[in-house]
Amino acid sequence: MQQPILQVFHKKLKMNKLSSSAVRIEGKKFIPGIAWFFLVLVLICLPGQELPTVNDWLGKIYFDKWIHVGLFTILAFLFMLPLLKSKLPITEKWSYVIKIAIATSIWGLTTEIIQKFFVPGRSFDIFDWSADSLGALIALLFSKIRFLKK
């Protein structure tokens, strides 16, 4: 007798869950990402008067935005890398990479809110958040191209 489709689907789902839950990623592999997270937090909490002044030409090329892109690209990628190197199924890796990119963008928004309300001489800048989100997107695209080719 044939099994109902939902029962077969449920069994497949259960098998996938079992196989992926058997994959463990050591917490210590996330230490670089955690350290970078706190470095970014310290940097965004610097009062405005303690920041170096930007030369005229650096301002013209939006140097501060490129700093944001770099900081958040590295942040997202450091959290993605342990998952990308794991033995998780590729669909799960991709799911986690997307979630990390979204979380990184949300963290960028959160840092702007922290600056506006808690850091003297700093303010909320939508373009900083855009640069942070671009950094997360770059990490996501790099991960997709380099690690998730299938």
Question: Over which residues does each language-model region extend?
Answer:
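Bulky hydrophobic segments
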Residues: 2-121, 126-129, 133-150
